[in-house]
């Protein structure tokens, strides 16, 4: 049983290129901190101001709240615009 956090960002005042560079740096930095999690950044194909970071864990322990890394990323991304943060739990077999 794993879990997935999705942190979506809708930015308005920053160029797409700069936002993508910032997201790449955040993913690199946070991946170094915790190698148990898979952290990836995505950009929305049809909306240039939308991006997201996905944090995937294959941990067997259940979660009921966002991870510490997820909360930190959310706080950082709020500087750039509207942020949505959702935690998903994998269905048991």
Regions picked out by a protein language model, each given a short descriptive name:
Residues 1-50, 55-71, 86-93:
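Short S/T/G/P-rich N-terminal loop/turn motif that feeds into the first structured element of a domain
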């Amino acid at each position: 049983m794993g879990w997935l956090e999705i942190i979506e960002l809708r930015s308005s005042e920053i160029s797409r290129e700069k936002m993508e560079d910032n997201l790449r740096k955040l993913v690199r930095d946070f991946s170094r901190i915790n190698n148990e999690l898979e952290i990836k950044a995505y950009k929305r194909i049809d909306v240039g101001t939308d991006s997201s970071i996905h944090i995937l864990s294959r941990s067997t322990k259940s979660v009921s709240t966002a991870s510490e890394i997820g909360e930190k990323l959310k706080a950082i991304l709020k500087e750039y615009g509207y942020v949505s943060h959702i935690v998903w739990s994998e269905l048991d077999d």
